[in-house]
C-alpha cells in the first residue's frame, strides 16, 4: 500500500507507481547519456528518409531543428518506450521515446552512427505519434 496526497488529503493506494519510467536497462541509460554528450559537442544529425522529410515533420509540430535537439536533450527514462517494430534497424542500438511537445505527442527515434570517422547522434524519427 502507498500513501498518496490528493487535494490535501492522505489516501491509501495499492497501485504500484513506476518511478523509473519504462525501465531502460543500464546499457540503454549509458547509450542515452552518450547520445546527449555527442549532441552537446555538436556531433548530431537528422536523417531524411524516403518516406519522411524531417523538416516538414518539425514544422508540423511547430519547432525548429535547434529546438528539436533541445527537446532531445531533456529525454529521460520517463519518455522511453520499447521499440516493438525496429523495421529500419536490425539492432537494439536505437532508442525510442514519446514526448509531449506543443500539445502534440511526438515519436522520437535515436541511434549512434559513424560519419567520416566521427560518432554522431542520429535522429531517425521526430514526428507526430500516430498510435
Give the positions of each predicted feature.
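Basic/aromatic recognition patch in beta-strand/loop cores that engages polyanionic ligands
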Residues: 87-113
Amino acid at each position: 500500500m502507498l500513501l498518496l496526497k490528493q487535494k490535501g488529503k492522505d489516501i491509501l493506494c495499492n497501485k504500484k507507481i513506476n518511478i523509473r519510467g519504462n525501465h531502460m536497462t543500464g546499457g540503454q541509460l549509458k547509450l542515452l547519456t552518450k547520445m546527449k554528450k555527442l549532441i552537446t559537442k555538436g556531433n548530431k544529425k537528422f536523417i531524411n528518409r524516403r518516406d519522411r522529410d524531417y523538416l516538414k515533420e518539425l514544422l508540423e509540430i511547430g519547432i525548429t531543428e535547434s529546438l528539436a535537439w533541445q527537446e532531445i536533450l531533456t529525454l529521460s527514462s520517463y519518455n522511453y518506450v520499447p521499440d516493438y517494430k525496429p523495421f529500419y534497424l536490425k539492432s537494439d542500438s536505437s532508442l525510442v521515446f514519446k514526448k509531449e511537445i506543443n500539445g502534440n505527442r511526438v515519436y522520437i527515434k535515436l541511434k549512434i552512427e559513424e560519419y567520416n570517422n566521427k560518432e554522431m547522434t542520429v535522429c531517425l524519427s521526430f514526428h507526430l505519434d500516430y498510435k
